[in-house]
Amino acid sequence: MGPGPRCAPGDPGWMLGALALMVAASGRFAFAFNLDTRFLVVKEAVNPGSLFGYSVALHRQTERQQRYLLLAGAPRDLSVADGYTNRTGAVYLCPLTALKDDCERMDISEKSDPDHHIIEDMWLGVTVASQGPAGRVLVCAHRYTQVLWSGMEDQRRMVGKCYVRGNDLQLDPGDDWQTYHNEMCNSNTDYLQTGMCQLGTSGGFTQNTVYFGAPGAYNWKGNSYMIQRKDWDLSEYSYKGSEDQGNLYIGYTVQVGSAVLHPTYITVVAGAPRHQHMGAVFLLSQESGGDLKRKQVLEGTQVGAYFGSAIALADLNNDGWQDLLVGAPYYFERKEEVGGAVYVFMNQAGTSFPDQPSLLLHGPSRSAFGISIASIGDINQDGFQDIAVGAPFEGLGKVYIYHSSSGGLLRQPQQIVHGDKLGLPGLSTFGYSLSGKMDVDDNSYPDLLVGSLSDHIVLLRARPVINILQRTLVARPAVLDPSLCTPTSCVQVELCFAYNQSAGNPSYRRNITLAYTLEADRDRRPPRLRFARSQSAVFHGFLSMPETHCQTLELLLMDNVRDKLRPIVIAMNYSLPLRMPDRLKLGMRSLDAYPVLNQAQALENHTEVHFQKECGPDNKCDSNLQMRAAFVSEQLQPLSRLQYSRDTKKLFLSINVTNTPSRERAGEDAHEALLTLEVPPALLLSSVRPSGTCQANETILCELGNPFKRNQRMELLIAFEVIGVTLHTRDLKAQLQLSTSSHQDNLQPMTLILQVDYTLQASLSLMTHRLQSFFGGTVMGEAGMKTVEDVGSPLKYEFQVSPVGDGLAALGTLVLGLEWPYEVTNGKWLLYPTEIIIHSNESWPCQPPGNLVNPLNLILSDPGDKPHSPQRRRRQLDPGGDQGSPPVTLAAAKKAKSETVLTCASGRARCVWLECPIPDTSNVTNVTVKARVWNSTFIEDYRDFDRVRVDGWATLFLRTSIPTINMENKTTWFSVDIDSELVEELPAEIELWLVLVAVSAGLLLLGLIIILLWKCGFFKRARTRALYEAKRQKAEMKSQPSETERLTDDY
């Protein structure tokens, strides 16, 4: 039967206009199953635009002739020419032929009588239903109108009308079913009663009942009617609900069946798509007195979804109770791109249905998914009822086929029939109406008739379904010893097939050919086996049946197989290749030659081949890999902390791996034993002992053995270059993971954490450790001093700090501290600091806390020497410790007669602590400390000493709150020798004549001495012969000259 009208009662164009706005756009895909789409029976309208296919039904005629017919309603078809009417609608009966235009109009004679009834545009064929094999046919026209006269004024009542015809689609006056008027609505009432009831909007048959929907009754509240016949008795039933509101459309669709709310009694299921604007389904039961009583109402969940516009009953899980499917074609979810829904309510053993659906099926956006629903029988003959759902506005229309199981309806469709892939010109809105549950080609599989709004109907026939039996796959031997392989075979595989038809037809013995594919070691690359015939790991073959057929294949072992623990999986999958026509073929060609494989069966099989291993009788290796690891020094001593400095180059990791038995584990061979190490970027793999064991990529992978045998031990020593440790590095983490293809489930990763102590390397140097200065003159008090020159002679120390390397930033600060001899024990000034300047990229003064530098705020100026008289001069001293030798003074040229030393350690001087932070820079930093000798103190307290030495200390240290960063303090001493001021007398000038006399006397004396030496022969030289003779005589006397003589022999 058809799903009922898709227009609002009383307005034939409302729904058509609304549906015209809906355009489908979906690309869903499902595996094609057993509804054939190549050999079709297609029928087209005689009169285009008649909505031929608006409603459809499959019918089996058994009277007068045996045949199957396709019934199609065309509610907008032209009327039979009578001179009074133009368009009444019609119902067509179509034979199962290859022709598209051989449908005949069903003879329903209704003469036009405008004074009593109006048949113009009565939508004959809005509902078409068949009672089943050898049953009758129901045809309705829900816009059939009665005319009432009140004086000269006529009143029209659109009560609707239904016609029952015999099995041969002819009127039999002797059949009470056909002659009964079926007028359930009273045309003498107005729309508030049943005067506009629109009977026949929906309707159908059971074996002893005919039922109708009348959604326009009672101000379009709606009603459902049922006529039941038992023997010669006839009973009429209608629903008289307590609802007082209109526009519910109860009866828009109606289904009747038993085993719904009672095992044997009938239950009427009526849709009301406008109930509370969200739709509802009423479940009504028979009561005495002809009433239908409401038992349960299932309500929709979304406004405007038209929940209840299509309904179907089917026992989905084979529990003996019919379940309920409800369509809501205008349901939508914008974000999810959903358009249309089908609610599935599972029967609770006849007591009721749950308020919430057990399953909610969705269609794509704007598809009107669920506008038609049909129970189509068991099309694949798996023992469970199947369902078809139309989505006419998805593309050119689609029909979704859902299978069911013991758990109910399956969520995913098993097949989607695409209207645009059928190759039918002019086809659209495919799936607008559906009818099934009848096998029209006698192949034991029910078929499906699909209607549309485009004047086409299409018969989809079910292909036979093949169950593959005895799909065995056996490998011999099951445990492979590679030493027993021959050049032609290592493993032998045997596969066998047999089949039957799912419908259980024993006469179906077609010769079919299965295509199969065998793949050795499917999950591994490269594979470990190959087929001898194909020289690869994949083999394609064919097997012909109907009898059980087997085939045997030989396989060979690949060279250099490493993995001998995991079994070799030999997988098989198979299919049924058929040469289907490339184009559409119309007609009733037998589909027995085009079976399909049962998609519910697994279309693959597999077997395993194990390697012979020393792993006990179960051939299962239970290893017991254990590991100990630690960071060690070059002397292989464990490290608890890494004392890192810039001189640190290497770090070592010691790893010990064993595979020994324990109480819990057998300690059998560990195949493909691997060690994976993940180390931080600061560590770079340098070397491994034993060499060649490990390889470094993103991680370090060490091959321990294949297999790593029982009771085997192994020690690895891995050396890393330390390249990336910074001041921010707190620790070094290494993660070690043992793995094996043998069975061992307790291999947990090990994490080693080595704390890092970062030792900074900085240096402190002093340009001149020991300065020289002086004191003398007169005593001057603090009040009389204006400039630093008034204090005394100047001093300047130049400290140099080398770069640390990595910048400290916020981690800490380098500080130069000075233990400065500030005053003597009696509180008098000693060395007065005037200025501290730091030189790096820029220069700036250092101001230690406590106002210790130039506390008297004396005026700073460059020191200079004052002129002295020609007879007396002060010793010139270098106050800044310039490069080169200090000038020689009288005090420095001779040892001081008396000297004293002032230090803070001895208690003879008091020191203060001066601190200057060193900038965080990579350049060398110079710190200049300027001071003045407090002249007055030395004149008053140390005039009795020729020299006073004052000592102090400078320390470079790190100040940080990070415990892992440290630096060894750098300390140096500085000193100054302060001499008392001395005056040296210059010698008196000598007369010139005395000089001339002295020179002349000297020359005369020299001349006398030369004459005397000449007279004595001092200037005469010896002869050469005498020299040689004497030398030769000497050589003769001493046969072996001494070493000294040898060295001096030529002189």
UniProtKB/Swiss-Prot annotation:
Highest taxon above the source species: Eukaryota
Entry binding sites for Ca(2+) 1: 315, 317, 319, 323
Function of the protein: Integrin alpha-3/beta-1 is a receptor for fibronectin, laminin, collagen, epiligrin, thrombospondin and CSPG4. Integrin alpha-3/beta-1 provides a docking site for FAP (seprase) at invadopodia plasma membranes in a collagen-dependent manner and hence may participate in the adhesion, formation of invadopodia and matrix degradation processes, promoting cell invasion. Alpha-3/beta-1 may mediate with LGALS3 the stimulation by CSPG4 of endothelial cells migration.
Taxonomic placement: Eukaryota, Metazoa, Chordata, Craniata, Vertebrata
Position of sequence motif GFFKR motif: 1017-1021
Disulfide bonding pattern of the chain: 94-103, 140-162, 185-197, 485-490, 496-550, 615-621, 694-702, 846-904, 911-916
Cytoplasmic domain ranges by topology: 1020-1051
Residues that span the membrane, as ranges: 992-1019
Glycosylation site residues: 86, 500, 511, 573, 605, 656, 697, 841, 923, 926, 935, 969
Ranges for region Disordered: 860-888
Keywords: Calcium, Cell adhesion, Cell junction, Cell membrane, Cell projection, Cleavage on pair of basic residues, Disulfide bond, Glycoprotein, Integrin, Lipoprotein, Membrane, Metal-binding, Phosphoprotein, Receptor, Repeat, Signal, Transmembrane, Transmembrane helix
Binding site for Ca(2+) 3: 439, 441, 443, 445, 447
Extracellular side stretches: 33-991
FG-GAP repeat coordinates: 38-103, 110-171, 185-235, 236-292, 293-354, 356-411, 415-477
Protein name: Integrin alpha-3
Gene Ontology process terms (BP): cell adhesion mediated by integrin; cell-cell adhesion; cell-matrix adhesion; integrin-mediated signaling pathway; leukocyte migration; positive regulation of protein localization to plasma membrane
Organism: Cricetulus griseus
